[in-house]
A protein has these predicted regions:
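C-terminal edge and immediately downstream basic/flexible tail or linker adjoining helix-turn-helix-like DNA-binding
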Residues: 104, 113-121
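Alpha-helical residues within the helix-turn-helix
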Residues: 70, 81, 87-88
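Solvent-exposed, charged/polar functional surfaces in cytosolic regulatory/catalytic domains
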Residues: 49, 86, 115
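N-terminal helix-turn-helix DNA-binding core of bacterial DNA-binding proteins
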Residues: 33, 37-77, 97, 101-108
Length: 121
């Protein structure tokens, strides 16, 4: 019984294992899903009234933690917790000056402040 030689090469295996290219509509749908996921994460960061107050306060200008504690009538650990969540979400950015941490809104934070102000009007 004669055997036929295998003509499979590494190139053929590599080509066969590549996933088929996605159609344009599927790529666009995937991009929209990723945008929705990013928006969902962002909205989770601002889903707390205290964090919204922090954003609105920082929309008026940079503040240090002590000023935010006084403005919010909350303890420093509580305010620091909210600031950490907002910082992690890319909504605020810190600046160290001596022993004080000053916080300000990022571009995303500024846009969120405008939206929140519009909703509260």
């Amino acid at each position: 019984m004669a055997t036929t030689p295998k003509t499979t090469t590494l190139k053929t295996i590599a080509l066969a294992s590549k996933p088929a290219a996605k159609p344009k509509a599927a790529k666009e749908a995937e991009a929209r899903l990723q945008q929705a996921r990013r928006a969902s994460i962002l909205l989770k960061h601002v889903s707390d009234p205290t964090r919204l107050q922090v954003i609105l306060s920082l929309a008026e200008g940079e503040r240090h933690v002590g000023a935010l504690c006084e403005h919010l009538s909350q303890s420093q650990p509580a305010v620091s917790h909210h600031l950490a969540l907002l910082r992690h979400g890319g909504i605020i950015s810190p600046r160290r000056a001596g022993k004080n941490n000053f916080y300000s809104l990022t571009d995303i934070g500024s846009e969120l402040a405008k939206v929140v102000n519009g909703l509260m009007a």
